[in-house]
Amino acid sequence: MPCPSQSSDELEFFVNGKKVTEKNVDPEVTLLAFLRKNLRLTGTKYACGTGSCGACTVMVSQHDPVCKKTRHFSVMACLVPLCSLHGAAVTTVEGVGSIKTRLHPVQERLAKSHGTQCGFCSPGMVMSMYALLRNHPQPSEEQLLEALGGNLCRCTGYRPILESGRTFCMESDGCLQKGTGQCCLDQKEGDSSGSKSDICTELFVKDEFQPLDPTQELIFPPELLRMAENPEKQTLTFYGERITWIAPGTLQELLVLKAKYPEAPLISGNTALGPAMKSQGHFYPVLLSPARIPDLRMVTKTSGGLTIGACCSLAQVKDVLAESISELPEEKTQTYRALLKHLRSLAGQQIRNMASLGGHVISRHYYSDLNPILSVGNATLNLLSEEGLRQIPLNGHFLAGLANEDLKPEEILGSVYIPHSQKREFVSAFRQAQCHQNALPDVNAGMRVLFKEGTDIIEELSIAYGGVGPTTVSAHRSCQQLLGRRWNALLLDEACRLLLDEVSLPGSAVGGKVEFRRTLIVSFFFKFYLEVLQELKADKRLLPESTDSQRYPEIADGSRSSLGDFQVTLPQGVQTYQRVNSHQPLQDPVGRPIMHLSGLKHATGEAVFCDDIPRVDKELFMALVTSTRAHARIISIDSSEVLDLPGVVDVITAEDIPGNNGEEDDKLLAVDKVLCVGQVVCAVVAETDVQAKRATKKIKITYEDLKPVLFTIEDAIQHNSFLCPEKKLEQGNMEEAFENVDQIVEGKVHVGGQEHFYMETQRVLVIPKTEDKELDMYVSTQDPAHVQKTVSSALNIPLSRITCHVKRVGGGFGGKVGRPAVFGAIAAVGAVKTGRPIRLVLDREDDMLITGGRHPLFAKYKVGFMNSGRIKALDIECYINGGCTLDDSELVTEFLVLKLENAYKIRNLRLRGRACMTNLPSNTAFRGFGFPQGALVTESCITAVAAKCGLPPEKIREKNMYKTVDKTIYKQAFNPEPLIRCWNECLDKSSFAIRRTRVDEFNKKSYWRKRGIAVVPMKFSVGFAATSYHQAAALVHIYTDGSVLVAHGGNELGQGIHTKMLQVASRELKIPMSYLHTSETCTAAVPNTIATAASVGADVNGRAVQNACQILLKRLEPVIKKNPEGTWRDWIEAAFEQRISLSATGYNRGYKAFMDWEKGEGDPFPYYVYGAACSEVEIDCLTGAHKKMRTDIVMDACCSLNPAIDVGQIEGAFIQGMGLYTTEDVHYSPEGVLYSRSPDKYKIPTVTDVPEQFNVSLLPSSQTPLTIYSSKGLGESGMFLGSSVFFAIADAVAAARRQRDIAEDFTVKSPATPERVRMACADRFTDMIPRDDPKTFKPWSIPIA
């Protein structure tokens, strides 16, 4: 390789209009790292590091001297090598606009449309929309969806983000609700006691937004324009510590370099090479960049086809194909249309902007979406070397890497030739993935057939599959055997048999889902068969007039439904809430849809998160070393090699902890043995994060494996491995009740786990002070007091010496209640030992590997009922997978059992729960805290009863629902009147009865597509079961200028607690919110705080803020009486002069929770949140894909403190719950290694998963006396309502099974992934696939529930 002692060339580019010149660029440095560390532009966030989430989105502008145009495109900064930006202009969120200078309309609209919650994803959302608007100032709705397809948000549910983007779009023709022909604004208001004049449907005022003026954007720097038009042809070389980057200026130079460094890969978009080098250990000392060579970006159109340069991005390829389709006759564009179809859903927009056609082809990934189509479309690869041009077909031989049909080490791919399709030729593409967009396919396919002229006899047939082998697999042998056959039903049967014989998938195949993937092989061909049959029937031009029309049989109406894919459209919806009383003063913000206080800062990137804090003097970085064994004794930890590495300062082990090493069963750092893969064993401290992370790979740990090793709930039950005693509630006489019923049904329910996937990973900054062993800690946590206590215990220092600061948290969902204390303590030990500040920021993979998530559940039920549907007895036994330590598993078990009954009064009821101990990372608190799993069990019982009775599930729900004031199974009294109102309004607003009939009519006519509709009720108990957690304090200071600082014990997680607290203070002090400010949550200002969790943050802290403000106002009363015409500032100045204290501590001694498990009774919860949701879906029975057509939610919020924030909480929780029940599948290896630990392997919902029609109504005229201003906490309750989508899918599956005469007493496990839906819709294709004996192979993954 080149000598690194040589001097590097200068790298020149622009950032936000300012020139940047770097003389010593390390090729391993990414744009994201440079922006954050070197330029201190921290608005661009690190969230995944693999280009899969969009948090690091920026815009890159480059001038193309060939077409004389400047391109603006969004990219993922975490993947962009800094070296690749020579001559480019980068725009970050700071360059778009700021609060300090001028807001850009994108930023303003995102914030004011309530499109930010935690705000961590917001800069990325802004940049994706901004890049779109730079290219299309008035985009279409389809373009908006495409632009945001690569951006993830875990908080909002996307609807308000899309709503903000819609304000820039071309006006549509209206918003007719799908299937009703009515405008969403014409919804019925239901049977509410509030009049229509009291109901509002506007959360923001569109007319107040500043207009978009495209002429005011940053221009492309003239200096870069000159560089592009008159490029320096010499080779640029950048030498790093380990890698050399060479960017030649001409094609010939590149070919010479490739001959000199034949093993050096070409790096273009870095979308494949980057993740491989980061996560898979690949390393290349020399990288060759073809970015400066225009020859490799050329596009040539000829009469026979398209030649596209290998360095063209996939986005450019997409544009070229779309242009050709618009210019050419349809018969010539079959292959182009198939490619374009996959390009719309392949990855996200940013990756399509970065990834090159050549890289996509050459990588030959088994999941490649384009190679199967290029292969069947007879594409040709133009290979270049010093020896000249060599052409090879992109066929099965190339894809298999056969010697004579592959690239030689000294060759590069110059371009790809894609011929036009021809008359009598049909080309189609198919793919099925966990989500519609930004998800790798489970299986994809390209298929092409050419018929002999005037016949349906096959002349050529090509079929290629992705996702069924190590690379794209060509079914060449099957195709050859089908030549000369007619396109009819006999061919279909023979083709399926041949394909299954040739395209074999072993039972242990990587990725699992083997039977599903086998089924897709033939399901896709059936779709292709029908598509071609339809075209043959419809297109008379293909056949001479004398051809017998009976040759092409009519496609049955039911089969016609399998044609085409689900179309994704921008969601529509309406949000309704009750207006504030007309007599309420205008300055009183309570009940109004106030924007999140940090909304504008979120949108401009000026909101400071934990890792955005500037590096402090002498700061070190920490990286964790985790166990690679599930259950083993630690024989030794050898760090000798590590301590000699550059930059490494120390290795922290359990021996370095001066105090307590955590709990007995939950150590901070492992001692003697490990209990799971991912347990933290030790930590490396180094000068930089890169040095620390590299050093962790050199720690040598010797293990001795121990038995037993338990992963599944079934394993734990067999070994009697439990974390705590059984929790049980029972009422009535179970035995007698079961003896006196008409029918009994028994069943099982499985609910998978769920990753928190907060956008901001776990992170902490610890700064030791010079005196008295004091520590300042900046932590991303929901419970700073717990961090403080854990650090105090570990270091043996008083709590008063440790100050924890929480400015804001980039999402928590329960995942930042307990775990941050562990990371904080480990970092604090390192800080004390080294005497230097320590920063610990977990990579996404480590975060997901270590921290655990929602408890997977397995339940058995037995239900006895009358033929009328009245349930007389119900016995449920639940087991949750707690992982290797107790954590919150006992509490989750208690809440699970307490909440299992949901909305139903069942006189004879037995509920039991156990937490299993397994060798997996400990599962922990998660939004809903057991209710989303438990309530799904109960609703599954309801569905089973309905099926047996032959009655609609909603009738069974109504018959068994609480109706009047009653007591729960644990003897707590409550009034279900709001529950009944929510249920009735949901049925009414959703037009359920009408749509139920329409769904049934649709299903009668459609065989391969089925619709389902379901409505579920909810009774969600709010609060902690421990009395000590129902307390809070606040500290309010009034300064002499009249400004007010409010401190309280709640933590801002995105749920808007700071906004709500200032609304409370504004009302109590009778001053505008502009006078009020809150800075952070700090244990020095408000001590002994409780976790911000259980939906009571605003309840308990609101009362404390209210109390403090009332104390202050009481003190000011004499001053105000003396000068009633004075201003607020006058009164404050007078009070100061009179030595009246302008500081007050407020305190709330809240609800006295009580639960006696021995007696099975108590009052554990202060109140309930009631709600109901109705969802309608359509499923594709051949692939398992589904489309969410409409969701209506009615929620009892009582008197909402802030309708905009509360609606956002409901929508966000619903979408997160929908993810739990449909897409978020957790996979572990048979050795206990978590596979799904990055966003490309673990799929949370995206913008394309939002229901097409998404309506939310807050129940009007509802009251509760227990909370601040009669409001309710809504942070968690919407989670379970996502199950309405699950039960709608199950309803659609049931319809399919009925039509196929298959038993309806089936169970779809949660999540209802495409795999599970497809396999539940059993048919001729699922019947024909081969099935393996489970004893003959080792599965890729294991079911932990």
From Swiss-Prot:
Principal location: cytoplasm
Organismal lineage: Eukaryota, Metazoa, Chordata, Craniata, Vertebrata
EC class: oxidoreductase
Cofactor binding remark: Binds 2 [2Fe-2S] clusters per subunit.
Keyword Lipid metabolism: no
Boundaries of every FAD-binding PCMH-type domain copy: 238-423
Role, per record: Oxidase with broad substrate specificity, oxidizing aromatic azaheterocycles, such as phthalazine, as well as aldehydes, such as benzaldehyde and retinal.
The protein's name in its UniProt record: Aldehyde oxidase 2
InterPro entries: 2Fe-2S-bd, 2Fe-2S-bd_dom_sf, 2Fe-2S_ferredoxin-like_sf, 2Fe-2S_ferredoxin-type, 2Fe2S_fd_BS, Ald_Oxase/Xan_DH_a/b, Ald_Oxase/Xan_DH_a/b_sf, Ald_Oxase/xanthine_DH-like
SUPFAM superfamilies per record: 2Fe-2S ferredoxin-like, CO dehydrogenase flavoprotein C-terminal domain-like, CO dehydrogenase ISP C-domain like, CO dehydrogenase molybdoprotein N-domain-like, FAD-binding/transporter-associated domain-like, Molybdenum cofactor-binding domain
NCBIfam families in alphabetical order: mam_aldehyde_ox
Binding site for FAD: L266, I267, S268, G269, N270, T271, A272, L273, A347, S356, H360, D369, L413
Species, as recorded: Rattus norvegicus (Rat)
Subunit: Homodimer.
Pfam family, one: Ald_Xan_dh_C
Family per record: Belongs to the xanthine dehydrogenase family.
Residue span, 2Fe-2S ferredoxin-type domain: 9-96
Cofactor(s) demanded: [2Fe-2S] cluster; FAD; Mo-molybdopterin
Keywords, alphabetical: 2Fe-2S, Cytoplasm, FAD, Flavoprotein, Iron, Iron-sulfur, Metal-binding, Molybdenum, Oxidoreductase
Residues that bind [2Fe-2S] cluster 2: C118, C121, C153, C155
Reaction(s) this enzyme catalyzes, per UniProt: an aldehyde + O2 + H2O = a carboxylate + H2O2 + H(+)
GO molecular function annotation: 2 iron, 2 sulfur cluster binding; aldehyde oxidase activity; FAD binding; flavin adenine dinucleotide binding; iron ion binding; molybdopterin cofactor binding; NAD binding; protein homodimerization activity
